[in-house]
From Swiss-Prot:
Protein location: Virion
Organism superkingdom: Viruses
Subunit note: Homomultimer.
Family of this protein: Belongs to the NCLDV major capsid protein family.
GO MF terms, alphabetically ordered: structural molecule activity
Role noted for this protein: Major capsid protein that self assembles to form a T=133 or T=147 icosahedral capsid.
Natural source organism: Frog virus 3 (isolate Goorha) (FV-3)
A cellular component annotation (GO) from this entry: viral capsid
Keywords: Capsid protein, Late protein, Virion
Protein name according to UniProt: Major capsid protein
Taxonomic lineage: Viruses, Varidnaviria, Bamfordvirae, Nucleocytoviricota, Megaviricetes
Leader peptide range in chain numbering: none
């Protein structure tokens, strides 16, 4: 291996001598430094620690909702997460499917246990999201290095979502009680510059409200040879249907110096935040028509649209955006049948009778858009994205369209031939469509909004 001698290094100055107008536009002037000098950004002293959200009201039980107050023990809230302990579930030998019965939690347990979450200031909703958003957001923003850990957090693990045979059968087991964790994707959780300044909001009661689904919409009782699913009842389980659960909301609070605390409490501040909007759910039947449109009566500056056609044949089978219902596979695993493909064939976007996006194949929305503008391409089938922003996950504006100024915006979705086949039903055992499959079109929008903090309270200056 050769090396550059001292005289050879001198020739490197030729490169520096080529500096001209192009370089003036690309690089800094005489007061700039190279990448080899670390620039230091002095910040105020602070520390952070976890805190339990207290002042709980309501009942943390399946099918109920509860709310907690944001702790005042800190000056800023950096993030929040829900910890919930699932109950132990044992399928009795005398269940309604008998020896062929199996029991499991639905896919993405914590996404489905939580029906909705709302952040409110004095009963004014600042941000709200539901199961569909949790499914979609995690698909587009989850780095691969964190995916396995995230699945462990939300319960997407074999001990909970793989079928467990009834007592007395081969492979019989109990679905264990388990502590699950759901990071709550609020606007203040992704960028420290958007931390929630509770120190500046002494006159606001800040609460997080969590609505939980009923237990019979979460546990799947399925026949292990036909794939038939039956709504679960109390007599199927040892001890009956679980009711109350252990649930707590935790937050990371930051503590700052007295000088910064005093300055922040008297400063008027505008924060650019994100919110989630949902169009009314539209039931679609490809046997009646293959193309459907839904009006998108959204408001504010929309940065991204996310849409899915959800298979809603069985209420207990959540997070299913394919044409058919999963069945019990070999070794008591979950098997996706051959027709477990995307129900969407193509989609177009129309503004006021003008085509904004032509009819694009599903691969554009599920592969191309996420490749360029999101952190991840979805690993699950059936998720579709159109991002006005150059970076979906960046909370800072990088592109949007003000839907409040559009009088007629609609999304036109064409369903696939496989969806038409499955909607007719009549498939064989374990085909996933022995019964007619039902679908719902779900459209979500992520929008920017302005929160103004002034005189100890928050508000929305632009409604």
């Amino acid at each position: 291996m050769s090396s550059v001698t001292g005289s050879g290094i001198t020739s490197g100055f030729i490169d520096l001598a080529t500096y001209d107008n192009l370089e003036r536009a690309m690089y800094g002037g005489s007061d700039a430094t190279t990448y080899f000098v670390k620039e230091h950004y002095p910040v105020g002293w602070f520390t952070k620690l976890p805190s339990l959200a207290a002042k709980m009201s309501g009942n943390p039980a399946f099918g109920q909702q509860f709310s907690v107050g944001v702790p005042r023990s800190g000056d800023y809230i950096l993030n929040a997460w829900l910890v919930l302990k699932t109950p132990e579930v044992e399928l009795l030998a005398a269940n309604q499917l008998g020896d062929n019965g199996t029991i499991r939690w639905t896919k993405n347990p914590m996404h489905n246990i939580v029906e909705s979450v709302t952040l409110s200031f004095n009963d004014i909703s600042a941000q709200s999201f539901n199961t569909a958003y949790l499914d979609a957001w995690s698909e587009y923003t989850m780095p691969e290095a964190k995916r396995t850990g995230y699945y462990n957090m939300i319960g997407n693990t074999s001990d909970l979502i793989n079928p467990a045979p009834a007592t007395g059968q081969d492979g019989a087991r109990v679905l264990p009680a388990k502590n699950l964790v759901l990071p709550l994707p609020f606007f203040f959780s992704r960028d420290s510059g958007l931390a929630l300044p509770v120190v500046s909001l002494p006159y606001n009661e800040i609460r997080i409200t969590v609505k939980l689904r009923a237990i019979h919409d979460l546990l799947i009782l399925q026949h292990n040879t036909t794939g038939a699913i039956s709504p679960i009842v109390a007599s199927d389980l040892a001890g009956g249907l679980p009711d109350t659960v252990e649930a707590n909301v935790y937050m990371t609070v930051a503590l700052i110096t007295g000088d910064e605390r005093q300055a922040m409490s008297s400063t008027v501040r505008d924060m650019v935040v994100e919110q989630v909007q949902a169009a009314p759910v539209h039931m679609v039947n490809p046997r009646n028509a293959t193309t459907f449109h839904t009006d998108m009566r959204f408001s504010h500056a929309v940065k991204a649209l996310m849409f899915m056609v959800q298979n809603v044949t069985h209420p207990s089978v959540g997070s299913n955006y394919t044409c058919v219902t999963p069945v019990v596979g070999v070794g008591n695993t979950v098997l996706e049948p051959a027709l477990a493909v995307d129900p969407v064939k193509s989609a177009s976007l129309v503004y006021e009778n003008t085509t904004r996006l032509p009819d694009m194949g599903v691969e554009y929305y599920s592969l191309v858009e996420p490749w360029y503008y999101a952190t991840s391409i979805p690993v699950s089938t059936g998720h579709h994205l159109y991002s006005y922003a150059l970076s979906l996950q960046d909370p800072h504006p990088s592109g949007s369209t003000n839907y409040g100024r559009l009088t007629n915006a609609s999304l036109n979705v064409t369903l696939s031939a496989e969806a038409t086949t499955a909607a007719a039903g009549g498939g064989g055992n374990n085909s996933g469509y022995t019964t007619a499959q039902k679908y719902a079109l779900i459209v979500l929008a992520i929008n920017h909004n302005i929160i103004r903090i002034m005189n100890g309270s928050m508000g929305f200056p632009i409604l």
